[in-house]
Amino acid sequence: MKKNKLLVIFFLSCLFSYIIYNYTISNRINILILGDNYLINSKYKTYDKYLLDKYYNINDLNKLFTNDNETYKDIINNIKNNYYIYEKGKKVYLNQKITESDIIILNANNENYFEKCFKGKSIIKKYDENVTNDIIKLKEIISKISPAKVIVISNYCYNDKYQLYNGDINLNNLYFKYQNTKSKRLNDKVNYQIYSEIVKYIE
């Protein structure tokens, strides 16, 4: 009798462990970062590290598809060409990662921003229009292959139309409000503010 009770307790424990494990797995989130590596290549604590500290249930925070000076047009072309990289000797396809992601964070064109955004009004207007069109097109392409939530960290000059369509997080505002140096690399305060804005969209 005692042996039967122990067996019942054992099997119940296994069952509860299995249920808890599956619940935990099903509630884990996959975050994919696309664009240039400007915001995540820094001596400071960057927003992706803040995210890892906060969310214990992150299954994967993938930033392998970020590259130097990446533009939104580059990302569009990479998706169209089913771009892949090698990780641990195996091919990892961008489109597959997009379909597996719950959240996709876009941040690109940073080099163009610093080059164009402090020029004359006509140049700024053209820059804003081009980037607006690229982001709208990129969002449309992503939506066809993934239901993931897309968050855009935008480097844009002040333009109402651009902000209306793509102003998820205005890096320009955060930079001038919290950056206490003229360095292009963002300090801890700006990185924390970016992280805080992302959390609002996640939650």
Show where each model-derived region lies:
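Membrane-interface motif at the C-terminal end of an N-terminal transmembrane signal
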Residues: L15-I29
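Alpha-helical architecture
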Residues: L12-S13, L34, R185
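Alpha-helical cap/lid subdomain in secreted, periplasmic
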Residues: Y86-E203
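N-terminal Sec-pathway targeting helices
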Residues: M1-L12
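Conserved SGNH/GDSL esterase-like catalytic core that processes O-acyl groups on lipids
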Residues: I29-I33, Y38-K126
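A structural signal for short coil/turn segments at secondary-structure junctions
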Residues: T24-N27, Y55, I145-S146
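Compositionally biased amphipathic helical and low-complexity segments enriched in hydrophobic
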Residues: L7-V8, F16, D53, N172-Y175
